Regions:
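N-terminal type II signal-anchor transmembrane helix
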Residues: 1-66, 105, 366
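Extracytoplasmic/periplasmic proteins that interact with beta-lactams or build/remodel peptidoglycan
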Residues: 132-136, 148, 211, 246-457, ...
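Flexible glycine/proline-enriched surface loops and loop-helix/loop-strand junctions
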Residues: 79-81, 158-163, 199, 221-227, ...
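Peptidoglycan glycan-strand catalytic modules in the bacterial/periplasmic cell-wall system
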Residues: 2, 6, 16, 29, ...
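Active-site-adjacent helix/loop patches that line small-molecule binding or acyl-intermediate pockets
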Residues: 141-143, 148, 152, 347, ...
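Short, well-structured active-site flanking segments
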Residues: 107-116, 190-193, 252-257, 505-525, ...
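A penicillin-recognizing enzyme superfamily signal
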Residues: 345, 349-365, 397-462, 467, ...
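Short, glycine/proline-biased beta-turn/loop segments that scaffold the active-site neighborhood
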Residues: 263, 487-543, 616-629
Length: 763
């Protein structure tokens, strides 16, 4: 063999070895890839969700609160404000923009787009990662954050496997819907429904093309293309999306050019539980739905009555503790914050808006009067009757009720050190009706500042159905979160008198029955004499009717009626009217020293326009799960309290209160012409102003007063219920009647038969 032949053989041998090595590397690579995918498919390498989890992804959806007129009132959620929507509820603009920009061959591939993948590999990722929408969905749902290079290298193969499985389990429309429901658009806008609401104050179905393009632009990198913090980048990215839509013939060049010329016009609404419509109602609903079964050991001895009330609610009210009483198919209780429930309420968003507007309008004016009266008074905002020591005691008690105090106490600080903190100026935001005030003030002074603001509660419900249409628990939920509709109880004053008059009417008396208008002395159970005062001295000694007595809110006529019955009889009747709080069986009960909530008073007064039948407040009509399955429906609970004839007598007298008595202000100042009844109330020292009014269809109640009973006007004309509370009701009714779409007619009459004659018993 010559040297040439040897060299050729050597080269051939080297080539063979190289080829064998290359084939070996290729085969090994292929086998390695096959092995990796086999291990992934078996769940032995990385996490691969099982079939049942792929079929039922564990999404955390917020619970949505929906008004009677199908408006979203808000949501309950933790961490993620996500609400599920259906494919048919998403604008086609959103779908087209998403496909044109993120995955143009979406309808052609089966989870992995090989063409895009190869392009990404050839260009080393500079042309994008090649991920399909299905892969992105897989990453969103099941790809945890990688902790090392090995885990990061496995992420893509795992996503490919999951994506192919998703494509077999779901239709293309379902995958698009899941993707848009899952994506986080920042600012607590998780999912397309939240994003449409937060950025444009609209729904996914009503997104304009340029709005949809902006949101799709955020899908590439929401932080980088944040329209609030980086508007220029967001605009450029939106225009890129529009170019893509034009490129793939979803829109014409002319449309593209016209839309690109438009600026981004955000209608941003921050997601905050303390903001938005009906915040007090939403919080009330949250507490009721998540209530636990009452345990006696959790209540102090002095609070046993509240335990009995809560226990009765648990046993009789299906809404109370709903999440604990009802379980999902897997046996666990419903989670209000993650299970995506839909709660359909009785609240009407328009009437709720009118109620909040009425509260704000009147409370602003009333607050100005209160500030004027208390200006430069050293004891402000308290009554001039309080001593310095009494004021200090109130302020100390209020300090100890703050979150700041509890936090400092938990840190182990002593009382002296805590007081020093409370008397050290710090930056803070204070409430005012003209907007928040940024200032530097001591926490102690801020407590006193907040005490200057009068509080209120308002609730309106339909007399015959019990449907609660409006609920305002205070002047501003962000600053004053204590609910004065359901939680707070205050002395009711003369609004209690209709119960005693009802007792008399039910026992056979008539509005036209007369008695002497004179001082009455009663003896209570302890043998102590009680003689109430009265303002109507000009009529002293005259014969007056019971109708006149209620019309003028006469204490003497009320005391006369009280002399005909026992306190126990009055307590019993009030219990049947739905009053659950402390009721002491004493003769003075007839003038309203007892503490009652606005909700209870409104509930009770439904008895009058409803022919003697009390209708309990109905807050929710049905609850659905995230798939639209009905979990529960709710109907009004009714109780027959008095006879129809008695209710007719009471309507007659309470209408006269509005036409000629203490409620006449609604007629001459606010111009209300519709048939209506009602009663004002003012507690001792005019600490509490009340008004409960009703029309043939609506019953509404108002309370206004200070945070403490020692905070009140110094004169009766300003502090009476007709001045403090009635105007809110009157403003609300004006707005309700002005909105013809609501269907409340000023010509509607009370359902009193023609044969009824209020004077019949005296003829």
């Amino acid at each position: 063999m010559d040297k040439t032949t040897g060299k050729k053989a050597s080269k051939k041998s080297l080539t063979t070895r190289v080829m064998l090595w290359l084939w070996g590397i290729l085969i090994t690579g292929i086998l390695t890839v096959v092995l990796i995918f086999w291990l992934i498919c078996k769940g032995m390498l990385g996490y691969l969700p099982p079939l049942d989890e792929l079929q039922n992804p564990k999404n955390k959806f917020a619970t949505e609160i929906i008004s009677a007129d199908m408006q979203s009132l808000g949501r309950f959620y933790r961490n993620e404000n996500r609400v599920s929507v259906e494919y048919t509820d998403i604008s086609p603009y959103m779908i087209n923009a998403l496909i044109a920009t993120e995955d143009v061959r979406f309808y052609d591939h089966t989870g992995v787009d090989l063409k895009s993948l190869m392009r990404a590999i050839m260009k080393l990722g500079r042309a994008g990662g090649g991920s399909t929408l299905t892969q992105q969905l897989a990453k969103q749902l099941w790809s945890p954050r990688a902790n090392n290079i090995f885990e990061r290298a496995l992420q893509k193969p795992i996503e490919w496997v999951i994506a192919t499985k998703l494509e077999r389990l779901y239709s293309k429309e379902e995958i698009l819907t899941m993707y848009l429901n899952q994506f986080d658009f920042l600012y607590n806008a998780v999912g397309i429904k939240s994003a449409a609401q937060v950025y444009f104050s609209t729904t996914p179905a009503n997104l304009k093309m340029e709005e949809a393009a902006m949101l799709v632009g955020m899908c590439k990198n929401p932080s980088l293309y944040n329209p609030r913090r980086r508007p220029e980048r967001a605009l450029n990215r939106r225009n890129t999306v529009l170019d893509q839509m034009c490129k793939y013939e979803y829109i014409s060049q002319e449309v593209c050019d016209s839309l690109q010329a438009l600026p981004i016009e955000l209608k941003y609404q921050s997601v905050d539980h303390k903001q938005g419509l009906a915040p007090y109602f939403r919080e009330y609903l949250r507490l009721v739905l998540t209530a636990q079964e009452p345990q006696r050991s959790h209540y102090s001895e002095w609070n046993m009555l509240q335990y009995e009330i809560d226990k009765r609610q648990w046993e009789t009210n299906p809404l109370y503790g709903f999440c604990q009483k009802n379980h999902k198919p897997d046996g666990t209780p419903y989670d209000l914050y993650h299970d995506g429930l839909r709660i359909y309420t009785t609240i009407d968003s328009r009437m709720q808006q009118y109620a909040e507007e009425s509260v704000r309008e009147h409370m602003m004016d009333l607050q100005k009067s209160f500030f004027r009266e208390k200006r430069k008074k050293s004891y402000a905002p308290f009554s001039k009757d309080l001593s310095t020591e009494e004021i200090d005691a109130i302020m100390t008690r209020s300090m100890r009720q703050t979150d700041r105090y509890r936090a400092l106490k938990k840190q182990g600080m002593g009382e002296a050190a805590i007081r020093k903190v409370f008397n050290t100026p710090v930056e803070m935001q204070l409430f005012s009706y003209n907007g928040q005030i940024d200032t530097v003030m001591t926490p102690m002074d801020s407590i006193k500042w907040n005490k200057h603001f009068l509080r209120c509660g308002f609730m309106s419900m339909e007399a015959h159905t019990g449907a609660v249409k409006a609920y305002v628990g205070g002047p501003n939920f962000a600053h004053f979160q204590y609910d004065m509709v359901s939680t707070g109880r205050r002395q009711v004053g003369s609004t209690i008198k209709p119960y005693l008059f009802t007792l008399a009417m039910d026992e056979g008396m008539w509005p036209c029955d007369s008695t002497v208008n004179d001082s009455v002395t009663l003896i209570d159970g302890n043998g102590v004499a009680w003689t109430p005062r009265d303002e109507h001295l000009a009529n002293q000694g005259e014969m007056v009717t019971l109708n006149w007595g209620l019309e003028k809110s006469s204490n003497w006529i009320t005391a006369y009626l009280m002399s005909l019955f026992t306190p126990e009889q009055l307590v019993s009747l009030m219990r049947s009217f739905g009053i659950e709080g402390q009721l002491d069986p004493v003769v003075s009960l007839c003038l309203g020293p007892c503490e009652v909530s606005v909700k209870e008073m409104v509930d009770a007064y439904t008895t009058f326009p409803n022919k003697g039948i009390r209708v309990e407040p109905l807050f929710v009509t049905r609850i659905e799960d995230t798939n639209g399955n009905i979990l529960a429906t709710f109907t009004p609970q009714t109780h027959e309290i008095i006879s129809e004839t008695t209710s007719y007598k009471m309507i007659y007298m309470l209408r006269n209160v509005m036409d000629h008595g203490t409620g006449v202000r609604a007629r001459f100042r606010y111009g209300l012409k519709a048939p209506m009844g009602g009663k004002t109330g003012t507690s001792q020292n005019h600490s509490d102003g009340w008004f409960v009014g009703f029309t043939p269809s609506l019953v509404s109640g108002v309370w206004v007063g200070g945070e403490d009973r020692s905070i009140h006007f110094d004169n009766m004309s300003a502090g009476q219920g007709a001045n403090m509370a009635l105007p809110i009701w009157a403003l609300y009714m004006q707005k309700v009647y002005a909105d013809e779409e609501l269907g409340y007619d000023t010509e509607e009459q009370f359902d009193v038969p023609e044969w009824f004659d209020a004077e019949a018993g005296c003829k």
